[in-house]
């Protein structure tokens, strides 16, 4: 109990030390990452659900691309937020030099690759075989984009890149599977049990 109180106190103190730029960055990144994972996860789950539970196609063909659009917008906002965070002023949003500095950082490389991946996911709105292949490639690029920033920049870089990419693909699949499975369960569809078992097998 004592340790829990100490941890909570440390969290509260750390929260109080955050400035407004950090708070907005945390909020924007949380929303950007969540919509990104939902978009990619929906596209990945569409690959197997179209055979196991065809009823989910009508849901995922709109849900995934819609999340992708929001993800593109939210990820785009990270560049001006990063520029403002660096100098501690909102005026950096209109400063071409600071925006360029933020764009040329590892964050910019990551967002560029992620944006391309999200654009490819948009083709899942018409889930034909070729388009599903393209959207799957987009999911791979999205997962890879997270390896272009943060601790994966250290050595052994390519091993870390491979590990984080595989980890993100698994996370995308898990997150993207919850919405269609919940939708099937709510409708009490006959394919719910089969879909849940198939989801579990693929996840393992």
Each language-model region and where it sits:
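Polytopic transmembrane helical bundles with strong interfacial aromatic enrichment
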Residues: 1-204
